[in-house]
Design a protein with these regions (language model features):
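C-terminal motif of bacterial Sec signal peptides marking the signal peptidase cleavage site
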Residues: 26-29
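Extracellular/periplasmic metallocenter environments
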Residues: 52-61, 67-72, 76-90, 122-191, ...
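Contiguous segments within soluble domain cores/interaction surfaces
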Residues: 74, 81-109, 206, 213-242
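Bacterial N-terminal signal peptides that target proteins for export
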Residues: 2-19
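A substrate-binding/cap region within the structured catalytic cores of diverse enzymes
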Residues: 196
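Bacterial signal peptide processing site
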Residues: 31-34
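Post-signal peptide N-terminal segment of mature Sec-exported envelope proteins
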Residues: 39-54
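Extended, solvent-exposed segments with strong compositional bias
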Residues: 113-128, 245-262
Length: 307
């Protein structure tokens, strides 16, 4: 059940997309901390720029509307899915003299290297019909596109209208909001493992997650509840197999996940973990050069307890 770094249109990707499509990703902000409740909070930082993206149905395809231009630096993305199908908002920066169509082809390609001019800058994980997802991140100046690869059987959603472009102007980076949990994808110069996750603070229910990467390679994290009687080794074997046998060792219906971030980046996103117990944190991607095994087979699979 392998997936490529961008295309991700394999049976695993479709299964993950179907699972995340029914997860309530659009969450209200986490509760105020004690200082805020007592009226002693420090002065609030500067408000982020607002990036709003909405995808809806349009005949046989989709229609996506996005804010045309925003100030760079700290940005709050609000992604709303008004359609009948699952959608995602993967933000990419397009450097040089390249088009959004080129970006779609490069991102959804099943093989080959990811070009240097296409930078994966985070965004919102898959949102099901009627759901809203919110993520805060820093964006550099440039030309951007929102790509959507949450297809299941046919062409990628971006080829059917789930695509938008926008400009980001100069702005000062800002501090990300406080998080209640952290997951970091790490590239090790001296392995094994070549890649690994560090995680803390994940809990049952709503999480304000800081997802970060340290290194040069892109990562995401997908979190699966491990079914009773199953082990992390069985999970890895299942996902690494082209033709797995038997029932899956994880609960797809209660999975949660993030968009893809290039190396040395961070974002804060709201997601919900709906089942207590052990979870497998998994990265299905490969390196930017398109070579080598999936990151999950190179150390980027981790078990955490959620209560």
């Amino acid at each position: 059940m392998s997936t490529s770094a961008r295309g991700r249109r394999s049976s695993v990707r479709r299964s993950v997309a179907l699972a995340l499509a029914i997860v309530p990703l659009g969450l209200a902000a986490c509760g105020a901390d004690d200082a805020e409740k007592n009226g002693t909070a420090a002065k609030a930082p500067a408000a982020p720029a607002r990036l709003k993206i909405t995808t809806s149905d349009a005949g046989e395809g989709f229609r996506t509307v996005a804010t045309k231009s925003i100030k760079g630096g700290l940005v709050e993305l609000t992604f709303t899915n008004e359609g009948r199908d699952p959608h995602e908002a993967q933000l990419v920066r397009i450097d040089g003299d390249h088009t959004t169509d080129e970006a779609v082809k490069a991102y959804s390609a099943e093989e080959g290297a990811l070009p240097d001019w296409l930078r994966l800058t985070g965004g919102a994980g898959i949102a099901g019909p009627g759901q809203t997802a919110t993520t805060t991140l820093n964006l550099e100046p440039g030309t951007y596109a929102m790509l959507d690869d949450a297809d299941f059987m046919g062409p990628v959603n971006s080829e059917r209208g789930a695509l938008a472009s926008f400009e980001v102007t100069e702005g000062a980076p800002g501090e990300l909001p406080k998080s209640t949990a952290t997951v970091t994808g790490i590239d090790n110069k001296i392995g094994p493992p070549d890649h690994e996750f560090e995680a803390s603070g994940l809990k049952l229910g709503k999480n304000r997650l800081r997802f970060a990467t340290k290194g040069t390679e892109p990562h995401h994290v997908v979190m699966f509840p491990i079914l009773p009687g199953k082990s992390l080794e069985e999970v890895e074997k299942f996902f690494a197999s082209e033709r797995p046998s038997g029932p899956p060792p994880v609960d797809f219906a209660k999975a949660a996940g993030t968009a893809v971030l290039d190396g040395d980046a961070a974002e804060v996103t709201d997601l919900e973990l709906r089942k207590p117990g052990p979870y497998a944190l998994v990265c299905f991607l490969t390196d930017r050069d398109g070579k080598g095994k999936q990151h999950l087979s190179r150390g980027m699979i981790k078990e955490v307890e959620v209560s």
